[in-house]
Structures are given as C-alpha cells and as structure tokens.
Amino acid sequence: MYFATMRLAPTITLTCLAACALFMPAPASLAQDVPPGINPSFPPYKNVLELFTSQGCDTCPPADHVLAGFADRPNVIAITLPVDIWDYLGWKDTLASDKNSERQRAYAKARGDGAIYTPQVVVNGMIGVNGSNADAIEDALKITDEALRGARIPIRFWYERNTIKIETGDAPAGYHYKDATIWFAVVQKRAEVPIERGDNKGKTLTYTNIVREMLPVGSWNGKAMSLQLARTAIMRPETEAAVVLLQEGKAGPIIGAAWTGLW
C-alpha cells in the first residue's frame, strides 16, 4: 500500500532501553574467550534487507515471499519488520511493533524522500524499494554493496552461558566514523498467521525472520571494541535467532552485520 501523499514523520528519538543494565565493557582479551570449535576470525561481510510489511496490506504477501528467497542466500541477512500503520483498516497486525514503524519513518527522514509505504525493503540502510520487486532489490544490493566496498566493519557475536558477547574491528584506514549504533535484534525464524479481517481476510500469511525486538545496545567510534549483554535481559519465548547491526547514526548505512541461529 502506498500513501497518496508522502509526508515526513515527526522527529524520532530512539533511546537505549536500560543500556547500563543491558551491557558492560568486556575485557580487551575477548577474542581469546571464544569457546572451542568457534572460528576466531570475523565472518564474511553480509548485506542487510529489512522488509517493512503489514498483515493489513493486500500487496504485501508477494513481498513476504520474495524476502524468504533472499533469506536463503549466505551473503544476505533478510529480516521482517511488521509495522502497525494499517491497523486502523480493520485488522490489527499480530506481529507489528510501533518501534518498527518508527524505524521506517527514521529511514524516510534520513533519506530525505519521505517515502513510507508497504511493502518496502530498505537495502543496507541506504535505499528503499518496493518489497515485491525482486529485480529492484537486486539492483539496490549491487549499488549499495559497491558503495560500501572498503568501508565495512568486521563484527561478530556469540553466546556463552548467560552472556552474549559482541566484538567489532577497527575502521578501515581513511574512514572516520562517529556515533555509529550497535543494534541487537531478536528474531523468530518463521510464523504463519491466519487473517480474519481486513484486506487479507481468509488468507494465512507466512513470515520469515521476524524481528520481535530491536534495541540499541552500544555505540562505536571507529575503534575495535567488545561488549557483553545479559542474555536474560533480551530473551523472549519465541526467539530462535539474533542479529547484530552496526549502523551509522540510527538510520544510516549499515556498515557491519552478523547473524546467528544458536539460541
């Protein structure tokens, strides 16, 4: 669904929820703490697709299917962020979060185009395209991958008992970053939702890699760093995987990303 008139959202402020309780500095020797069997090197760089979708949007199911295809690629992290912007049409999205809607508005404001619609895929935090158009997503992946070449930051994370450990590398020579945000997202890998009212009434919609919570857990200034999260502070019953994003500002290019399904 598209708005007939695009309007910029109000200024959005995202706060780090109880940041002091969620994370604390890790020792400088964190790289030596990797459990046996885990490769101590950083994983290959990943491209990130964020699909903003809604159960109240009759043009969204094809996009949900397209995202599932991209999620199978080893060099792509594809996540679904259900939004609540169409809840007033008769069906309240059972997976939607107002934080996801805020994130979509923040992207529109950062890009300066005011484009807020569903289904929309934001590619590497830089370009917004129609989520049903696989060719447009492919083109945006190529453009943003090239734009970020040489500028990406190695990042990884792993679980150790009741702790989640995150580690980043240094910025490449010649690049100067300030106030990059480290996001931690908990993910449900799959959900099937029967729709009882609204434009998709009678359908059962399938979703892939649904973000159930996304929190800013730290900031990065271009230097290698590590931090630890209390696992119990962010665990949810439906959590099956997790994603860490390193993003310029809070809605800029995504310069680092990592995924794990071990939860």
Please place each PLM-identified region on the residue numbering.
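Bacterial N-terminal signal peptides that target proteins for export
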Residues: Y2-C16
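Ligand-binding face of N-terminal immunoglobulin V-set domains in extracellular IgSF glycoproteins
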Residues: V121
